[in-house]
């Protein structure tokens, strides 16, 4: 899939040092543009910059201080301190799970992972994202997490706090591929935007869409809630590119790409 640069007005793309075999650096959760060939069009999300074709490569959080290789390019992912988040959940059964709940979460993780592994080419993605909800950012991407002082997996999403019932919209056009009520995520939606770009929405109080439904940019898909394992009403928003969780905040920063060119 190829799209013009203008479709990426709000997406962070690192455009530095495209020389062959040069080592490049980026932060975890970012996207880097790598020179592409016509053979890459059906395999990657690509963008045309100054009449040259580039494929968009996500930088995994888990590979900090490591290098990945894309064709002839070496990309080293920086070590970055995103800070930490400590929360207390009064309901201990949501932290130290019973066997029944543990079995449930295991089954649910398989369902969710199957959806997130989806790769389709039905739609040309538009990375000119809009903010899915009006609220206050309560926890940013990359934070170390502690729940009741127990270390947990890092927070690779964006939490936006808002009043119960606040409208949530699709940040760009896509197809709903999963709707469900899950132990951790509560009422949950996954949207496929095409070519490995997916978004998910957790802890909703209401869901206004169905599986296989096409949603357009700005269309209402749900409402903020506190279902699942939470401490209060908020949207837990995750963005995936090629199965890598990238920083959602980069996609909604107005004029971010233009500032790099």
Predicted features along the sequence, with ranges:
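Small beta-strand-rich domains/subdomains or short beta-sheet motifs embedded
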Residues: 161, 167-171, 201, 212-215, ...
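Bacterial N-terminal signal peptides that target proteins for export
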Residues: 2-9
């Amino acid at each position: 899939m190829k799209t013009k640069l203008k479709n990426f007005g709000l997406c962070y793309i690192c455009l530095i040092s495209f020389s062959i075999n040069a080592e490049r650096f980026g932060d975890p959760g970012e996207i880097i543009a790598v020179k592409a060939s016509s053979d890459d069009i059906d395999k990657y999300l690509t963008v045309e910059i100054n009449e040259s074709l580039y494929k968009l490569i996500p930088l995994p959080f888990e590979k900090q201080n490591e290098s990945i290789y894309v064709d002839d390019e070496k990309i080293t992912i920086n070590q970055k301190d995103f800070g930490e988040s400590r929360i207390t959940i009064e309901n201990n059964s949501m932290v130290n799970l019973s066997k029944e709940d543990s079995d449930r979460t295991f089954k649910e993780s398989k369902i969710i992972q199957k959806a997130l592994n989806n790769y389709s080419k039905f739609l040309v993605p538009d990375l000119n994202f809009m903010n899915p909800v009006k609220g206050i950012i309560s926890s940013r991407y990359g934070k170390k997490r502690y729940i009741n002082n127990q270390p947990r997996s890092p927070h690779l999403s964006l939490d936006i706090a808002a009043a119960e019932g606040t409208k949530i919209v699709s940040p760009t056009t896509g197809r709903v591929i999963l709707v469900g009520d899950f132990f951790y995520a509560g009422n949950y939606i996954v949207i496929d935007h095409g070519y490995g770009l997916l978004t998910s929405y957790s802890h909703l109080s209401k869901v206004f869409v169905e599986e296989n439904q096409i949603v357009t940019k700005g269309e209402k898909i749900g409402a903020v809630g506190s279902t699942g394992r939470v401490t209060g009403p908020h949207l837990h928003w995750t963005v995936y590119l090629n199965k890598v969780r990238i920083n959602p905040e980069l996609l909604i920063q107005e004029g971010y790409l233009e500032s790099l060119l």
